[in-house]
């Protein structure tokens, strides 16, 4: 039973029902996925920023944002508006072109990665057969922007922050990719839709987190390092580097770094839920739910309900992971740069390689359980 509806065809048929010719209806559809992607990612970031401020305040026995809207929900909007109207300062001896291009290279690849994130069986902007490979490729572009920003600022703290960001990304990109390869090996596909389909049918018992417990931990640690979350926020360690590669930035360029960081955090949580937590899959098999309700699985209202439940489950799983990441910020102390690199190269990399080899052996030995 499919967990979704065909958004594109439904939208085109609705427009044609209003009398629009097919060509004009397709013209309306073309920019819609990009607009939805940008709006959805931005709203997700605003929610995460508010959650982080409230959860951080609760961890420190404070109230947190309170006056900007009910419970302070409009505080991220107020902060964003403030940064938009602040003066854009470029240091006198900085390279203006690289200084401007750096933040763009940080944000743009992360937004493009949302193209392959599925919220339901057909609720995905672009279902390409190399979706996960595209995400890994795009995620490797952002460190270039960070290094470029640090170098172009003509500031020693910015340069050190940029170098740390590049070293950190390279160190953890490889274990993360190896953990993803183990999932790809089990699902026999690089498509995010196929990876979720491979986990469906058995509810929570079919999720990859049970077959890949080591890969799940490797991916989570590497994802936190890629997002530069504590305890891996060395590129912008305020006690050592003022603000790292962000030191010389102000106004909207400064806001782009924070936007990129939080958008990347939401993206990592979404990809994590797709790879290990069944994506839009419900903890109870939806076939069983249909049987309990006494309706056919192909009933139209049940299909719409499944699509809504799929979106809800994907978002809930992702925000649960974000909640854990926020708690870790106030629980675990920052590591040193040598500890960071040792963890990536001397521990996570060999463990990820061993996990990949063990997954290959289990796939050959138990093909039914491991996607043979």
UniProtKB/Swiss-Prot annotation:
It is found in: Cellular thylakoid membrane. One of its GO terms (molecular function) is quinone binding. It catalyses: a plastoquinone + NADH + (n+1) H(+)(in) = a plastoquinol + NAD(+) + n H(+)(out); a plastoquinone + NADPH + (n+1) H(+)(in) = a plastoquinol + NADP(+) + n H(+)(out). Its EC number is 7.1.1.-. The keyword Glycoprotein does not apply. Keywords: Membrane, NAD, NADP, Plastoquinone, Quinone, Thylakoid, Translocase, Transmembrane, Transmembrane helix. The chain crosses the membrane at residues 29-51, 98-120, 130-152, 165-187, 202-224, 254-276, 305-327, 340-362. It is a multi-pass membrane protein. GO terms for biological process: aerobic respiration; photosynthesis, light reaction. InterPro entries: NADH_UbQ_OxRdtase_su1/FPO, NADH_UbQ_OxRdtase_su1_CS. It is an enzyme of class 7 (translocase). Pfam families: NADHdh (PF00146). One of its GO terms (cellular component) is plasma membrane-derived thylakoid membrane. NDH-1 shuttles electrons from an unknown electron donor, via FMN and iron-sulfur (Fe-S) centers, to quinones in the respiratory and/or the photosynthetic chain. The immediate electron acceptor for the enzyme in this species is believed to be plastoquinone. Couples the redox reaction to proton translocation, and thus conserves the redox energy in a proton gradient. NCBIfam families: PRK06076.1-2, PRK06076.1-5. NDH-1 is composed of at least 11 different subunits. Belongs to the complex I subunit 1 family. This is NAD(P)H-quinone oxidoreductase subunit 1. The gene is ndhA.
């Amino acid at each position: 039973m499919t967990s979704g509806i065909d958004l594109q065809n439904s939208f085109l048929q609705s427009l044609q029902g209003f009398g629009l010719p097919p060509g004009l209806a397709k013209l309306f559809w073309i920019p819609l996925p990009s607009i939805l992607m940008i709006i959805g990612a931005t709203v997700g970031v605003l929610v995460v920023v508010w959650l982080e401020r409230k959860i951080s305040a609760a961890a420190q026995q404070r109230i947190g944002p309170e006056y900007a809207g009910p419970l302070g929900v409009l505080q991220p909007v107020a902060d964003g508006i403030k940064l938009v109207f602040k003066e854009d300062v470029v240091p006198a001896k900085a390279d203006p072109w690289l200084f401007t291009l750096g933040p763009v290279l940080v944000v743009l690849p992360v937004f493009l990665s949302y193209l392959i994130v599925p919220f339901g069986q057909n609720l995905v902007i672009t279902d390409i057969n190399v979706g996960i490979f595209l995400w890994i490729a795009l995620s490797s572009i952002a460190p270039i922007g960070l290094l470029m920003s640090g170098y172009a600022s003509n500031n020693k703290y910015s340069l050190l922050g940029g170098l740390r960001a590049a070293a950190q990304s390279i160190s953890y990109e490889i274990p993360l990719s190896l953990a993803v390869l183990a999932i790809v090996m089990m699902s026999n596909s690089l498509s995010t839709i196929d990876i979720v389909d491979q986990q469906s049918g058995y509810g929570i018992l079919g999720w990859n987190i049970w077959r890949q417990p080591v890969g799940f931990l490797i991916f989570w640690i590497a994802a936190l390092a890629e997002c530069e979350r504590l305890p891996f926020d060395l590129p912008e360690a305020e006690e050592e580097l003022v603000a790292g590669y962000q030191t010389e930035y102000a106004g909207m360029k400064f806001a782009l770094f924070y936007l990129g960081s939080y958008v990347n955090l939401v993206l990592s949580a979404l990809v994590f839920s797709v790879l290990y937590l069944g994506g839009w899959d419900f903890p109870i098999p939806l076939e069983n739910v249909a049987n309990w309700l006494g309706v056919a699985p192909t009933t139209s209202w049940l299909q719409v309900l499944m699509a809504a439940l799929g979106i809800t489950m994907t978002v809930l799983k992702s925000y649960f992971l974000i909640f854990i990441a926020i708690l870790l910020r106030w629980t675990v102390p920052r590591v040193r740069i040598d500890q960071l690199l040792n963890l990536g190269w001397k521990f996570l990399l060999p463990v990820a390689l061993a996990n990949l080899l063990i997954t290959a052996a289990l796939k050959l030995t138990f093909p039914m359980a491991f996607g043979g």
